[in-house]
UniProtKB/Swiss-Prot annotation:
Known cofactor(s): Zn(2+)
Biological source species: Aliivibrio fischeri (strain ATCC 700601 / ES114) (Vibrio fischeri)
Protein's recorded name: Queuine tRNA-ribosyltransferase
UniProt keyword terms in alphabetical order: Glycosyltransferase, Metal-binding, Queuosine biosynthesis, Transferase, tRNA processing, Zinc
Function field: Catalyzes the base-exchange of a guanine (G) residue with the queuine precursor 7-aminomethyl-7-deazaguanine (PreQ1) at position 34 (anticodon wobble position) in tRNAs with GU(N) anticodons (tRNA-Asp, -Asn, -His and -Tyr). Catalysis occurs through a double-displacement mechanism. The nucleophile active site attacks the C1' of nucleotide 34 to detach the guanine base from the RNA, forming a covalent enzyme-RNA intermediate. The proton acceptor active site deprotonates the incoming PreQ1, allowing a nucleophilic attack on the C1' of the ribose to form the product.
This protein's encoding gene: tgt
Region (RNA binding) location: 245-251, 269-273
Source domain of life: Bacteria
Amino acid sequence: MKYELIKKQGRARRGQLQFDRGTVETPAFMPVGTYGTVKGMTPEEVKGTGAEILLGNTFHLWLRPGQEIMKLHGDLHDFMNWKGPILTDSGGFQVFSLGKTRKITEEGVHFRSPVNGDKIFMDAEKSMQIQYDLGSDVVMIFDECTPYPATHDEARISMERSIRWAERSRNEFDRQENPNALFGIVQGGVYEDLRDVSVEALTKIGFDGYAVGGLAVGEPKEDMHRILEHTCPQLPEDKPRYLMGVGKPEDLVEGVRRGIDMFDCVMPTRNARNGHLFVTGGVIKIRNAKHKTDTTPLDPECDCYTCQNYSKSYLHHLDRCNEILGARLNTIHNLRYYQRIMASIRKALEEDRFEQFVEEFYARRDREVPPLKDL
């Protein structure tokens, strides 16, 4: 993987990630394909929304179908028939979200399989091995996602363990002679001094890119913005920056304003299945009775298959009848909406009018532009 920083405006960055499997224009949003599928979509449909890179889930694909089935096909690209690059998370967050059914030790994490209750152990080395078998173009280190809230001491202990696991991940990745990219993950909760320690340790180990982890786990938005403003300027300028598990459309804009290049989130797909659809002016809840007789498209500005062919009335009808097509059409629209936002951000950066884009983005939602700490 090669990263090229093409242009900057303030902290916002316009760049390119070059992989053997294709080029990804940044800032980029990655749809989430947890089990080797973006729910309800064929790979061609996902590509049709403008997505150039997908996220796969190491933890879930390890439990089902498992490494052996993956190797029978070649790798995850062959298994799911996605021709572009794939980033896989390390499984750290999924293990973290198992709650009381897991036990974290210095070696790794002991837990019971959510599939069949079997006792399972995962560590940095195992995560690297699974991601190697998946053929991931971007491999994430195995880390511990610091919960929120956490005391300074709890966040410190968690962050220090993540650093040791990062080193083990790096060593195993190098031992495999894996030709792909390995990203480090900055932890430290909402504490700036801990983020400093994490950044320093990770940059010393050396990675192909750096993720900011442990955000969007329940902390106030102001804390997320503060940590990004503090952390991003310390990360190497010539490496991509990835904000994990984020987020709402405004979170993408705010992340880019603070120097982030890559995002992923289940929100566009999950919300689509629940009938919450993103449009230029905000959100439409297609379930609401007022859409029953509305023959207009979801968003007159949207060029997606759904908006070009169907009315709100039809989508309301499909939702009320729990038709699979409704979830599919909604997902196509939401994924395209997210890709349109990213394309608009990239164009605005190319044309040196990103600040104007931000003002217009919030004006259409009748909201104030959130404050940004001076450079």
